[in-house]
Amino acid sequence: MSMTRRYSSTQYSNKMSLQSLSSLLLLVTLFFSPAFALKKSYIVYLGSHAHLPQISSAHLDGVAHSHRTFLASFVGSHENAKEAIFYSYKRHINGFAAILDENEAAEIAKHPDVVSVFPNKGRKLHTTHSWNFMLLAKNGVVHKSSLWNKAGYGEDTIIANLDTGVWPESKSFSDEGYGAVPARWKGRCHKDVPCNRKLIGARYFNKGYLAYTGLPSNASYETCRDHDGHGSHTLSTAAGNFVPGANVFGIGNGTASGGSPKARVAAYKVCWPPVDGAECFDADILAAIEAAIEDGVDVLSASVGGDAGDYMSDGIAIGSFHAVKNGVTVVCSAGNSGPKSGTVSNVAPWVITVGASSMDREFQAFVELKNGQSFKGTSLSKPLPEEKMYSLISAADANVANGNVTDALLCKKGSLDPKKVKGKILVCLRGDNARVDKGMQAAAAGAAGMVLCNDKASGNEIISDAHVLPASQIDYKDGETLFSYLSSTKDPKGYIKAPTATLNTKPAPFMASFSSRGPNTITPGILKPDITAPGVNIIAAFTEATGPTDLDSDNRRTPFNTESGTSMSCPHISGVVGLLKTLHPHWSPAAIRSAIMTTSRTRNNRRKPMVDESFKKANPFSYGSGHVQPNKAAHPGLVYDLTTGDYLDFLCAVGYNNTVVQLFAEDPQYTCRQGANLLDFNYPSITVPNLTGSITVTRKLKNVGPPATYNARFREPLGVRVSVEPKQLTFNKTGEVKIFQMTLRPLPVTPSGYVFGELTWTDSHHYVRSPIVVQLSS
């Protein structure tokens, strides 16, 4: 249909300008008026509930009604409140998640009954020889002294994860040989996951994700199934069955298992396709943690996180406090933002925060040059089609006409010229885009293979990926040599050997470059991470809904895959926690953490101090107390225990007022202890930021072993004088508690910055070691 009447261009322009201007003014007025203020999803946190042990459904309905009534006073009506709220946290966490505008959120935050109001923030996922490396077995044999044997492989402990769901058909979650589900379990399974006596729970939480994205709910958001692979990988690492013949495309063949292979497992799906760089949202995480507490889990593994933040506006910190208060041990990943300092996340003192390090297995894929040079690389990709020398080309020399050379060097999409690449081995630089994406771009350009060279930040950390083409990743120094060869040789040629699994490699462990580092930017007086565990090239169960690279064009499928990240180290500790919970069912979460931390090691398999990705000496900001030793954690001798009251005292010591802490605890009688001092918080590590004069630290040790006398030994941090009183502690019975004090003072001439030492209490059988971290001012 055409218009017969028309304006001259000038008439049309003037008329439209006036109309547009008036419309624009109207839109601006409406947009910035209170009625049209931009709405977002928020969490309104009201603290804890003071429920009786048995809660009726009517009581829970009453809690939800009280949330709506409370919100109605700010949004105009009960109906508006009902429409705005998409989660009511009714059982352990007191609060709700709702769609609010900024003004409403600000007004609610002023109410005296409100602890905090904060945006529904997004979190990132922090993406089996390892158990042999940690000495739970040796050459496939489980010895009598193994924690596996002592703890019955974690039998009937219930371990859950917050992740991308689960692939229930995996053999890692088969219930063959399992007895009845523990009677204490109150959880359930969504209809799309066939649960059994091993996989006893599967639920999804999506309202926070949908509220943030504005997407309508559909079948793809109403499932517990794992379409990413991350959740199945982490859950099976924590508590998957023994599965013989596990491998990735024939490489690394062996028996896969989790840390607590006879534990029961539950999956709480809180992570969805990425949006704005995040997959898992606080509103969903809080709802899942509340459900996990009520369902009866013993251990909660969370391989998710974001930037460290204030405890009262951090969904993971809030939820995990309520879990720990109810006896659930919470284990969190430290993050993958290393090696930069001050990047560690999940720093709340009631969670176990886990860094990532290597182990003594590599999937070696050597790169050989025509001139006889050879570089040790790693890969899980298929071999080259022919055993011959191939032409090599630097990706920087393969850029498209008028293209960005840096993009080409990084092998980014659209940066490579197929005419230059076809049939050759392409040499790319690590950084920016995903390692597997570089392989995909190389393959798309027609490369026969790819060598991926580490950038300086990645150092010696090389990661095995199941690339879509023959490939190998080499370290930074070898990469420099290779690029030099390419630039100085007229006809450079090389070959990538087929990958093979190699054991007993040295040095191991060393810290992964990606593992986030301290110091703790929220509370510098608490050392984080707490511990490190294997997190590089970990083979575990995977989904069959996507390929091992998670790229849309990767049509391959594998029941097991290798992944790296603190996401992988976190469930290693969760599995160890499951064993300790089985062996010592009455230990508190703090006692379990103490046992893991104080029995760890800081030396590698060369009996030298652990190193970082550049093979320089590492320190507690990267590994915390050290690398986990499960068998020693079974009988630590002494523990640094903590109660809910201690955590409340901690909050007072770091500056939260009495009213906020009362709401947090749901205890109107609680009063911040006068003189509460962070230096006396009974943490298993000792950290003193900004030491300028003499200070005294107080700690309490609880005997969990037989009667014994312990003597103090210490290694002083450089420039610090240390004394301990008393120097000897005698325990006459199990459960007895003794107090000691450590005094630290700077020497007249001291270095500036952080310095490190350690304190060990020993009865010649047990060695209870704590790192000492001190910041000195020049």
Curated annotation (Swiss-Prot):
Start and end residues of each Peptidase S8 domain: 130-634
Annotated organism of origin: Arabidopsis thaliana
Biological function: Serine protease. Has a substrate preference for the hydrophobic residues Phe and Ala and the basic residue Asp in the P1 position, and for Asp, Leu or Ala in the P1' position. Interferes with CLAVATA 3 (CLV3) signaling, but does not cleave CLV3.
UniProt key word Cell membrane: yes
Protein's UniProt name: Subtilisin-like protease SBT5.4
GO biological process, one term: proteolysis
Signal sequence region: 1-35
Pfam family, one: PA
Keyword terms of this UniProt record: Cell membrane, Endoplasmic reticulum, Glycoprotein, Growth regulation, Hydrolase, Membrane, Protease, Serine protease, Signal
Outcome recorded upon mutating residue 567 to A: Loss of activity
GO MF annotations in UniProt: serine-type endopeptidase activity
Gene deletion effect: No visible phenotype under normal growth conditions.
Gene: SBT5.4
Cellular component GO terms held in the UniProt record: endoplasmic reticulum; plasma membrane
Active site: 163 (charge relay system), 230 (charge relay system), 567 (charge relay system)
Recorded family membership: Belongs to the peptidase S8 family.
